[in-house]
Amino acid sequence: MKYDVTRLVLVGLVSGLRSQLGVAAVALTTEAGESARPASLFAGVWGKRGAAAGAVGELVADKLPWTPSRLTPAGVASRMAFGGFAAVALASREPDGAPPALAAAVGAAASAVGTLAGAYWRRTAAEAGRPDWPAALLEDAAALLLAGTAVGHTDAARRAVAGAGRTASGALAGALSPSPGRG
């Protein structure tokens, strides 16, 4: 049997960028009558609210100066766990979805890649002397777009990213424009 692992890779990448967002994307798009486990955990209002609260909390906490690096062993492991879980939940919603072990492996591996890519992006911006917050907002926008694509809601993702993009692009333009005396 063939499995389309593209969406599993995307939801894993999202979890590497923002650990809670992959699970939240799956939760918020799970139908109320879903009975397949583990997606059924998100079929009720409390599952959706809990996942959304975790994602919003992380989007805010990521910008705080005392937030630890995602590259700590605990940070990488938790992102891989969230990526694996999000991929398993996503696959469980589909009649011909990948088996749980395959979905977990794909989601966790993609999450590791997303973790490293996000850290590289933020470090590159910092090394260029740019403030962190515009890079963080652009990373948020990329994660939201990938999340929407992973769960099959590309129009909603585009609208969310457009709003975030307008804010981030204005901030980024100001942060990237040369200041006096800075070549």
Predicted regions and their residues:
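Short amphipathic, positively biased membrane-proximal segments
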Residues: 1-183
